[in-house]
Regions:
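Short, cationic low-complexity segments
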Residues: 149-154
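Small/polar-rich, solvent-exposed N-terminal microdomains that initiate assembly or binding
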Residues: 1-60
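Long, highly charged amphipathic alpha-helices
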Residues: 6-10, 83, 87, 91
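Acidic-leaning, charged glycine-interspersed low-complexity segments
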Residues: 93-142
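Short, conserved, surface-exposed binding loops centered on an aromatic residue
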Residues: 35-37, 62-66, 90
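Peripheral, non-catalytic regulatory segments
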Residues: 144-146
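Oligomerization/assembly interface segments of phage tail-like spikes and tubes
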Residues: 64-80, 88, 127-141
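Short, well-structured hydrophobic secondary-structure segments
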Residues: 40-47, 72-83
Length: 154
């Protein structure tokens, strides 16, 4: 299953950054610096945009398994923003990334990635250019229904 806390842990594993540089994107997201002169690192934002089922659920015993496509967005602001955005476009070729997603029963979609730029405000200072990458992954939800399957009546 892929949700926001799991996505954060995957990104933490991939990038190995301090917690302050990995932030969820919210509607009022600006460059999350306290000091506008803090150019030490590149800020990474993340947000799950949508979750969409694409086939019917399958029942295995008392468990229902539903395949889901999860669309999410990564944003990068700082000195390495473009470089980090470009690396996301190659994630399927990195075994560490593949393993990080596999550990949570997820897989990056190869053809569903777009990188683009977007200007964001910097709290009254000059705007910054943000690199944005939209991508998706396949995952599944497993639910224990506590019900005996209808086709297995005894």
């Amino acid at each position: 299953m892929l949700n926001a806390p799991i996505l954060r842990s995957i990104l933490k594993e991939i990038y190995g950054v301090e917690d302050k540089y990995l932030v969820p994107i919210s509607t009022n997201w600006f460059i999350p610096t306290v000091d506008p002169n803090d150019h030490v690192g590149t800020w990474i934002g993340y947000r799950i945009i949508s979750k969409r089922p694409y086939v019917r659920a399958a029942q295995f015993g008392k468990d229902m398994v539903k395949p889901i496509k999860v669309q999410f967005r990564l944003t990068f602001v700082g000195p390495q923003a473009e470089e980090l955005a470009d690396q996301v476009l190659l994630w399927e070729d990195r075994t560490d990334v593949v393993r990080a997603f596999e550990a949570h029963k997820a897989q990056i979609n190869y053809t569903d990635r777009t990188a683009f730029t977007y200007p964001i405000r910097n709290g009254g200072y000059n705007d910054e250019m943000c690199w944005v990458v939209d991508l998706s992954a396949q995952t599944s939800y497993e639910v224990d229904t506590k019900q005996v399957p209808w086709f297995n009546k005894e």
